[in-house]
């Protein structure tokens, strides 16, 4: 799996100070402090300063909103010299936004959401329909409690709930004054009959334990996640439009001073309407409120003030890094994934902050990412292994990669793997048929050889790296293809000579040479491979697929020239394909051509 890397600058101002620790203040308009340490020495201390722009773009931003009061004095837990991990205060990224919402019955919320879609919040990863504690009432309870009814003269008559509520709290009928304990007991005694409760039968039903089995703990916890605070956001009602009766005695503390209306939901309105009254709202919203008022003497829709709190987990990786890194620095916003490992290629300017960047990458991509590494040097050795530094997470570099439906175990410390070539490998596999016999000269752990073995007749795979051969053999067994793959561990030229001087030579139809730095230099090994055979014999010459890099202005012409020089053959019909741009001005290419007859019957090249 590959994540493309996009680098972009940002506009947060940066000040370099001296000191040991960095501390975030109440908002990004004040300094945020970081602890940036290496294993050998401390780096300069950085303080980040941001100026709020009154014309910020639509949507949530760390530049907008306020910090909650209990986080005003939060400071970073700074690491001390010698610690490997860089720790920063995640609470410093909590932001509170004041909003207006419409409280509506739960049965109407989705229809109204579609109707008012353009006037709702519509923020990424935030639902327009919000839940708060106490907004859900079971259907059975609603039926028992009933609701207020409108009489024929337009006045509201007493509902079942009002009568029941008075009896629960010992209030008199009519004026609703609280009865003395003696009168209350006397009233209760008169309501009894031979069958038990008469007027209290609803209360008796409420007090009985449920006959159904209680839900499992997992189900109850799942239901709780839908209300209140979750891992990245929380909605709270700050101000109700109207106070009602105190329902704590019947329904619990969550229903203190709420007007009875059954199960409800909040439709979060656009942030533009946060401080506006009803008359200032758009006509579409006012029409909904008027329709509801016209249908009933008591409106079931209600405007409420609420606040939306966004936590550290809400913000994207690039937003966090943009807030933490100095002004003008390019923000690394993506990386390559190899199994559970995130592979960074940090620039020199990022190295003082590598621990910080790795920490954010790990936080924002759990659980699929468990290790973050950075390449410390270019590939120079014959085994093509990279020098990697583990920056965060698990120290193990052994992982499992799934590609083209196959599983590959790799150890990035001892073998080479590039996930960015997955598309090219699939494109190459599409060139093969079920009758092909493939010869992979530089197979590595087998991304091409094993994937091809599922499709073609036979595969011969070779690599110089003994660790790669071990993983190649285990991966072939892992994918149940060991019977179709024969593995070799030798130099590329020796392998080509051994294969094409054996009885297998005439069966080989495809040769893959995926060693972009040096593959073209191995083409001279094909000169004279059939020199001992008769020219009159009908031979099916193999198709060669060779990869290479080119920094030339015309990369195709440059690579074609190198192929002709290596083969000592002028007339070579080559099909070129640009694989990817690996660096500014540097292309990776694939050249495909049928091995010329004049090359295979030429005199052999002597190697000194």
Swiss-Prot record:
Ligand binding (S-adenosyl-L-methionine) = 425, 463-464, 491-492, 514
Question: Subcellular localization, per the record?
Answer: Mitochondrion matrix; Nucleus; Cytoplasm
PROSITE patterns reported in the protein's UniProt record: SAM_MT_TRM5_TYW2
User: Does this entry carry the keyword tRNA processing?
Assistant: yes
- Residue span of region Disordered: 207-229
Q: What class of enzyme is it?
A: transferase
> What GO molecular function annotations does the UniProt record carry, in alphabetical order?
tRNA (guanine(37)-N1)-methyltransferase activity; tRNA methyltransferase activity
Q: Which UniProt keywords apply?
A: Cytoplasm, Methyltransferase, Mitochondrion, Nucleus, S-adenosyl-L-methionine, Transferase, tRNA processing
GO annotation (BP), single: tRNA N1-guanine methylation
Compositional bias annotation for Basic and acidic residues:
216-229
Database matches in Gene3D superfamilies: Met-10+ protein-like domains (3.30.300.110), Vaccinia Virus protein VP39 (3.40.50.150)
According to UniProt, the reaction catalysed is: guanosine(37) in tRNA + S-adenosyl-L-methionine = N(1)-methylguanosine(37) in tRNA + S-adenosyl-L-homocysteine + H(+)
Q: Which InterPro entries match?
A: MeTrfase_TRM5/TYW2, SAM-dependent_MTases_sf, TRM5-TYW2-like_MTfase, TRM5/TYW2-like_N, tRNA_Gua_MeTrfase_euk
Q: Which Pfam families match?
A: TRM5-TYW2_MTfase, TYW2_N_2
The EC designation for this entry is 2.1.1.228
GO CC terms in record: cytoplasm; mitochondrial matrix; nucleus
HAMAP family named among the record's database cross-references: TRM5 (MF_03152)
| Role | Specifically methylates the N1 position of guanosine-37 in various cytoplasmic and mitochondrial tRNAs. Methylation is not dependent on the nature of the nucleoside 5' of the target nucleoside. This is the first step in the biosynthesis of wybutosine (yW), a modified base adjacent to the anticodon of tRNAs and required for accurate decoding.
Family the entry assigns: Belongs to the class I-like SAM-binding methyltransferase superfamily. TRM5/TYW2 family.
Q: PANTHER family this protein is in?
A: TRNA (GUANINE(37)-N1)-METHYLTRANSFERASE 2 (PTHR23245:SF43), TRNA METHYLTRANSFERASE (PTHR23245)
Assembly and binders: Monomer.
Name of the featured protein: tRNA (guanine(37)-N(1))-methyltransferase 1
